[in-house]
Amino acid sequence: YDPELDLVYWGTGNPSPVFDGDGRPGANLYTSSIVALDPDDGTIRWHYQLTPHDVWDYDAVGESILFEQGGRKLLAK
């Protein structure tokens, strides 16, 4: 949680079925992604999909680290 920006960061899992991408066409939006949520109402403020149409089980559920460098806020996965 970032109290200055009032955002909750959430990592999401890979789509299913994992290795058969033919059955789920497209990028499979919000899977294998970092999602920034408004904590008051759950609205998605932004997202970044690390692996669109993930067929390699590269989900994004590991811990995220929020830090500042050079005056910028950064999020490392």
Predicted region positions:
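Short coil/turn segments that connect the beta-strands within blades of beta-propeller domains
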Residues: 4-6, 72-73
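Extracytoplasmic/lumenal domain signature
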Residues: 21-60, 67-72
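Active-site-proximal flexible loops/turns
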Residues: 5, 9, 45
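Short loop/turn segments immediately following the C-termini of beta-strands
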Residues: 13
